[in-house]
Amino acid sequence: MSGLDGVKRTPPLQTHSIIISDQVPSDQGAHQYLRLRAQSEATQVMAEPGEGGSETVALPFPPPSEEGGVPQDPAGRGGTPQFRVVGGRGHVAIKAGQEEGQPPAEGLAAASVVMAADHSLKKGVQGGEKALEICGAERSASELTAGAEAEAEEVKTGKCATISAAVAERESAEVMVKEGLAEKEVVEEQMEVEEQPPEGEEIEVAEEDRLEEEAREEEGPWPLHEALRMDPLEAIQLELDTVNAQADRAFQQLEHKFGRMRRHYLERRNYIIQNIPGFWMTAFRNHPQLSAMIRGQDAEMLRYITNLEVKELRHPRTGCKFKFFFRRNPYFRNKLIVKEYEVRSSGRVVSLSTPIIWRRGHEPQSFIRRNQDLICSFFTWFSDHSLPESDKIAEIIKEDLWPNPLQYYLLREGVRRARRRPLREPVEIPRPFGFQSG
């Protein structure tokens, strides 16, 4: 039998009690009668009438006797026993011993029947409690199962909603992409329609192309072939200019790098040369090109030179600077004379020098005559900036004497020693002192 919650339940125990009351004629029977009555009242179980219920059927006890004892039956055979009948239907009442009395032995037998029935009823009640506990456990398990199924259904519903949302987003994105492609195709079609000229314009364009072709044919093949030859030549020249520019930049970087490395050694060399009397005068007089310009008074003035420095300007290709240091002498008052060559942006070379403050009566002769040629004197080189010979002196000093003056100083005694590099003649340059060292 199943209830409303779907759990199978055990039908209640159906009991029908039949209580038989007899009169107990003796004291022993009265005592048993009272005990049985108390037990029957304590163990009566009321149930709903009809099918599946437990019913108690009891006969009313006969009234007590006039003597104040236990009620007696008319025959005086004993008390009325009470007992329960299990499994009956409806209300049943069985009277026994109302008209005919029963012997006391039958009263004892009835009491035994009641006790047995009472024991069976207790077992039935305990079984019913156990059945109720089992039913409660089954109901709790069914409730937990139902709750888990509801939660799983909710999770499944949430997942379905998420998947549905993702599918909807993907479909909307695909729709947007399709719309964009459709718009792009429409725009391209419009552009193609706009680019297509009218029929009249197409005719004009074709006519212009035909006229241009006729003009090229009339000019002949020579200009075309010349253009074909000039284009590769111009391309090669552009590439060559690019390589030259890269070489210039690399050369400048190398000059800066090694210039810093040389500076340390040049400072040490200058310090040693300052302590050698007449070092630079001897080097100048032993140089094959410079010795021709040192005559008479120039040789005397060079005896007072203490040091010489050649420095390039900020950019190596923009020029250089010559510094001559002198000690006190009777010819001029300057202790430092500077000769500077600067290459301007136009490419023209400009020379500048410190004015020499001559002492009275010691102005040098500007030119000397040798083999019918006018030769610039050494000290005239400081102040005269017009003759090409002046630029030649600067080139010799910068490129030959300054890098290695020791080799010319050692020629004083005519001793040929091993040189780090051989003597070289100064190279003629196409323009005045361009300092084309690279």
Swiss-Prot record:
Chain spans, region Disordered: 41-82
Cross-link (Glycyl lysine isopeptide (Lys-Gly) (interchain with G-Cter in SUMO2)): K156
Entry's localization field: Nucleus, Nucleolus
Keywords on record: Isopeptide bond, Nucleus, Ubl conjugation
Lineage: superkingdom: Eukaryota
GO CC terms: nucleolus
GO-annotated biological processes: nucleosome assembly
Pfam families named in the record: NAP
Post-translational modification: Ubiquitinated by the CRL2(APPBP2) complex, which recognizes the Arg-Xaa-Xaa-Gly sequence at the C-terminus, leading to its degradation.
Family per similarity comment: Belongs to the nucleosome assembly protein (NAP) family.
Protein name per UniProt: Testis-specific Y-encoded-like protein 1
Species in which this protein is naturally found: Pongo abelii
Gene encoding the protein: TSPYL1
